[in-house]
């Protein structure tokens, strides 16, 4: 094919030279008739794969018609030039949430992501088997962190003396704050209340206004996912995550505490001592249930100052008839003892108080508690949280196997003590107080 092109080209050149040599008046521009004829002949004998050559000739003819000078024919054919058409890069569509806006300010998709999280959480800890809904978390790291916490809670509940599978739960949400960081990122403050029916209990356990903070990010597929989560619920704020081993760094201590506590089951129960002014347990429990999800305006609330748990417990004791003394009292927000609002401070007071101030036992068998007594708890030591026993759970033989607790920060009612991640638990038995001995008065 290429030889035929060369032959045709040489023939045209010879014809042109012969005309010049003869001094003919029929001088011809190389870009006119003969070249056109030759070009058409080449096209007629060119396969489909060489059609670009015709396009190049058409371009040359357009240039000639426009008066653009063209070069004389070369002795060898020029290389074919391929014209490659390129399309402009298309811009990537921005992710967009097209779901309806709710009255609380969230979109339906954002709200559904939060409910998906809570459904996954309660189903997992309730079934003792982690199950995560699709597209819940924005990364593997946040999913591993969350599910490690869930697994720790399951491990704690599996070791309870009662059945802590959840047969039923029902939560409600209150959206407290929405902060839009960007069109694809939003921070949401949520307050959750939840009723739970544990398999081993005949009453509902209730949580009130548990504070959550969610960060949601909108992916390229227009799906919201959770990229961060914080919760007031225990154990989320005391849990220690070991990312290198994807494990709970405290789980060994947490489970060891349960073993030591359960070892007291069936142990000796001391007889309650007599006292001049017995503790009114019924009045104490009544007060606890009244203010478990509220704050008595006669006292300062310490929720934002480390927690209101011990302040609440002290109010319960006082409502049950325990008198305020020079080592334990609340007169005003500016005049009070640390032992009134601090777990560690109260433990020190209860341990050293004389019977005319407080008659109690801080070293009793764990399973000898009664309604109105305190359960203090933590992980390394029982000094992080204070709760009130509102009811006692007994087995078929009449022996205590668990307690139903009421507390502030978090606000819980009828919550089983054995469900807490705070497994280092101390019973403080409250008996009342005695009159001041005569020798002290003299």
Where do the PLM segments sit?
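N-terminal capping segments
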Residues: 102, 257-338
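Low-complexity, Gly/Ser/Thr/Pro-rich intrinsically disordered linker/tail segments
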Residues: 404-409, 417-442
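N-terminal, intrinsically disordered, polar/charged segments of Gram-positive cell-envelope systems
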Residues: 26-121
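Surface-exposed, charged secondary-structure patches
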Residues: 151-201
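Core segments of small alpha/beta cavity-forming domains
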Residues: 93-163, 290, 297-301, 312-320
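Short beta-strand edge/turn micro-motifs at domain boundaries
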Residues: 207-262, 403-406
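...with weaker cross-activation on analogous glycine-rich loops/strands in unrelated enzymes
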Residues: 185, 333-405
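C-terminal motif of bacterial Sec signal peptides marking the signal peptidase cleavage site
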Residues: 18-21
């Amino acid at each position: 094919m290429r030889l035929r092109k060369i032959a045709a080209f040489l023939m045209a050149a010879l014809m042109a030279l012969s005309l010049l040599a003869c001094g003919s008046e029929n001088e011809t521009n190389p870009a006119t008739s003969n070249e056109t004829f030759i070009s058409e002949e080449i096209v007629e004998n060119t396969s489909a794969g060489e059609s670009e050559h015709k396009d190049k000739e058409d371009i040359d003819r357009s240039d000639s018609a426009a008066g653009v000078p063209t070069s004389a024919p070369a002795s060898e054919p020029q290389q074919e030039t391929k014209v490659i058409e390129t399309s402009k890069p298309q811009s990537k569509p921005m992710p967009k949430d097209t779901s309806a806006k709710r009255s609380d300010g969230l979109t339906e998709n954002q709200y559904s992501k939060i409910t998906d999280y809570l459904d996954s959480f309660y189903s997992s800890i309730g079934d003792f088997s982690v199950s995560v809904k699709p597209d819940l978390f924005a990364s593997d790291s946040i999913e591993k962190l969350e599910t490690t916490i869930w697994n720790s809670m399951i491990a704690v509940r599996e070791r309870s003396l009662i059945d802590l599978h959840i047969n039923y739960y029902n939560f409600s949400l209150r959206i407290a704050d929405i902060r839009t960081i960007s069109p694809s990122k939003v921070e949401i403050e949520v307050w959750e209340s939840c009723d739970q029916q544990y398999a081993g209990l005949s009453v509902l356990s209730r949580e009130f206004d548990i504070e959550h903070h969610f960060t949601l990010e909108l992916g390229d597929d227009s799906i919201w996912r959770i990229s961060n989560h914080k919760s007031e619920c225990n154990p989320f704020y005391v849990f220690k995550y070991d990312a290198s081993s994807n494990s709970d760094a405290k789980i060994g201590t947490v489970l060891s505490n349960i073993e030591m506590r359960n070892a007291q089951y069936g142990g000796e129960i001391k007889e309650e001592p007599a006292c001049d002014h017995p503790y009114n347990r019924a009045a104490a429990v009544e007060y606890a249930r009244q203010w478990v999800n509220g704050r008595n305006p006669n006292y300062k609330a310490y929720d934002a100052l480390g927690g209101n748990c011990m302040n609440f417990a002290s109010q319960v004791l006082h409502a049950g008839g325990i008198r305020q003394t020079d080592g334990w009292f609340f007169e005003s927000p500016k005049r009070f003892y640390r032992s009134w609002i601090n777990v560690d401070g109260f433990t020190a007071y209860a341990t050293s108080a004389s019977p005319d101030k407080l008659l109690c036992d801080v070293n009793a068998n764990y399973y000898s508690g009664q309604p109105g007594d305190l359960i203090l708890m933590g992980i390394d030591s029982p000094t992080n949280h204070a709760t009130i026993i509102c009811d006692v759970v007994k087995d078929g033989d009449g022996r205590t196997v668990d307690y139903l607790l009421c507390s502030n920060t978090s606000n819980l009612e009828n919550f089983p003590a054995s469900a807490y991640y705070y497994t280092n638990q101390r019973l403080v038995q409250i008996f009342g107080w005695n009159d001041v001995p005569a020798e002290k008065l003299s």
